[in-house]
Amino acid sequence: LVGSEMCIRDSFSTILLYVTIAFLLLWQLPWCYNFFVVKPEKTPFTLYSFVIGDFALMGQEEGKGTVRRDAAGNIYSEAAFDSILPMFYFRQLMSDERFPDTINGIAVTPKIVQTENFNFRSVPTDINAPSIGLYPLLESMSGRVDLKMPDDVFRITSKGIEFIDMASNSVNAEKSLQFTEAMAKKDFHFPAIEIVGNPTVKKEYDEGYLLLDADRRLFHLKQVKGRPYVRAIPLPEGLTLEHLYLTEFRNKKTLAFLTDVNNAFYVLRSRTYDIVKTGIPAFNPETDAVSYTHLRAHETRHDL
């Protein structure tokens, strides 16, 4: 009887082992197939050239090396490619003394290019990474050119905002009460479900943080001469925001980029706090990596 039980256990263990191996094979076979059979696709670097009115592409081609062409198939030398993308290669054109005075009849200068151009990048790892929930609030109007990191950090709880002195690890009750009352007066409902800023001194100016309160309403919070600045930002009818990106670009025309629960993309303008829906295709920040480059010498009504 004992021998029979041992045989049954051995048989069960063997069956379980084979089943486990089968599941592992089913799980790994698609990956192995893709690894050994599927060739990686090389997506060419692509920008729109308003000089030629078409897309310009640069990529590696087998036996040819780096090839620069437009969507119509015309091939360009490296210097010619620089010329049809003057807003992107303006440093090279300046070095070669080939930067144009006008583009499509519009006067341009290197200063305008540096001010108006920007890059925006969003990757899922930034969105999905866990947060420690402690944020430094810089002084936005210190009167000095260089920004300075504060001696404290803040967190937002269900009761309010707390400022914690990093040296003593103690709560600054007076400052916490001052900011909590300022936020409550603007009808901020604690806690915050989204807190977004750029806590670094390696930027030209500071706009503090954008917040979504417990009801997903949008607020702007910053510190101005030691006092709280809180602005409730009205949302268009039916808009429910999901993710926020504080921009702090050089031209100061844009305060933030926003996405809603349907992954549509919006611009929050500075000063007016107007929210404008863009024509950029929807993307899910939690799963999709995107990169946008704004290369315009002048502003139009449809610019970001």
Segments and roles (model prediction):
Residues K111-I132, F163-H189, H220-L235, A264-F283:
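Surface-exposed loop/turn elements that mediate protein-protein interactions on large endomembrane-trafficking
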Residues D274-L304:
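Membrane-proximal extracellular "stem/stalk" segments
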Residues W31-F55:
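Alpha-helical transmembrane signal-anchor/signal-peptide segments
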Residues F188, I195-E237, T247:
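Secondary-structure-rich domain cores
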Residues L1-S11, T293-T300:
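Conserved small/polar residues in nucleotide/adenosyl-binding loops
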Residues P136-R144, F190-P199, L239-E248, P281-Y292:
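Repeated scaffold domains used in trafficking and secretory/extracellular systems
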Residues D54-S77, D82, P86, R91, ...:
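Short beta-strand elements that form the blades of beta-propeller/WD-repeat-like
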Residues T14-W31:
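Hydrophobic membrane-insertion alpha-helices, especially the h-region
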